[in-house]
């Protein structure tokens, strides 16, 4: 068995508070992801030293009238607890392998990183997640998370402990979006975020986008970087178990190339995996393929010296 470059802590932040109900009275199934991954062998595949879990607040559809976002106070409280755990993991020189949950879990992880120093973000997602309540039809935080962690939106989430922004715009790479509606992408295009939609990513080449990210690490002070992976970046033909599938998307070879390049870099601090919904994968076929493909790429990367 290979010895990991850093000890790995598997951290379960299985909050579903950032999503709306998939059907009346039914809460999103992403809360079950860590145990679904365990059942089908992910925890056995990835060499790790410890497992940590943080139970999220109860699910609701509550729309906070102050922030105009759902479950704002519960997400903020959970984020503060997350931050304490991630700070401890990273301070002990462990790699944080975080399992969601929905994309709102990035808020607590980002808060921890801001408290620890100056970190970059490589954001792999089938959507930009860059909007605010006036642009959102659902008011779910999981569709606004990248905007929140770069300082946009209500202070309840974007400015916890008066630390906004958790990531500077120019230190963020957002790759893989395939929602091309002009009204949707206008928000992110008016920022300093390095934005590669799926078409641009393929035209410029995956190695090119990653090389530019690594060059930014070398050009200025950085304490490390974090990787966000929303599995809806994958083609729904291979990853249909998500709440917002769109045609097209990355193949596993494309995703694995990114993961292996990023996670094997010595400044990579952690990876979060979000949105895979076991309720949409009743026989486990989809998660088994994810573990066989992306899980194996993660293990190879973390085991490199």
Give the residues covered by each predicted segment.
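Conserved alpha-helical scaffold segments that buttress catalytic/binding sites
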Residues: 2-305
């Amino acid at each position: 068995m290979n010895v990991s470059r850093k000890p790995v802590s598997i951290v379960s932040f299985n909050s579903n508070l950032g999503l709306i109900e998939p059907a009346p009275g039914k809460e999103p199934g992403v809360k079950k992801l860590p145990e679904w991954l365990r059942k089908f062998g992910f925890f056995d595949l990835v060499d790790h030293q410890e497992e940590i879990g943080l139970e999220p607040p109860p699910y609701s559809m509550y729309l906070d009238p102050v922030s105009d976002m759902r479950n704002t106070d519960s997400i903020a409280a959970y984020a503060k607890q997350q931050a304490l755990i991630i700070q401890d993991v990273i301070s002990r020189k462990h790699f944080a392998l975080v399992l969601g949950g929905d994309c709102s879990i990035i808020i607590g992880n980002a808060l921890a990183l801001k408290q620890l120093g100056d970190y970059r973000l490589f954001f792999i997602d089938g959507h930009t997640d860059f909007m605010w309540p006036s642009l959102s039809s659902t008011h779910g935080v999981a569709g606004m998370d990248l905007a929140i962690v770069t300082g946009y939106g209500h202070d309840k989430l974007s400015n916890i402990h008066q630390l906004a922004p958790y990531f500077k715009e120019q230190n963020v790479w957002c790759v893989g979006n395939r929602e091309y509606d002009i009204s949707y992408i206008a928000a992110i295009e008016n920022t300093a975020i390095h934005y590669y939609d799926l078409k641009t990513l393929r035209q410029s080449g995956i190695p090119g986008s990653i090389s530019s990210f690594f060059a930014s690490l070398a050009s200025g002070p950085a304490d490390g970087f974090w990787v966000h992976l929303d599995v809806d970046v994958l083609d729904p033909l291979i990853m249909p178990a998500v709440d917002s599938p769109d045609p097209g998307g990355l193949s596993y070879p494309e995703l694995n190339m990114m993961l292996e390049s990023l996670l094997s870099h010595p400044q990579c601090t952690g990876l979060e995996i979000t949105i895979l919904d076991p309720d949409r994968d009743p026989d486990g076929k989809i998660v088994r393929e994810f573990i066989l493909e992306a899980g194996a790429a993660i293990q190879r990367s973390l085991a490199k010296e």
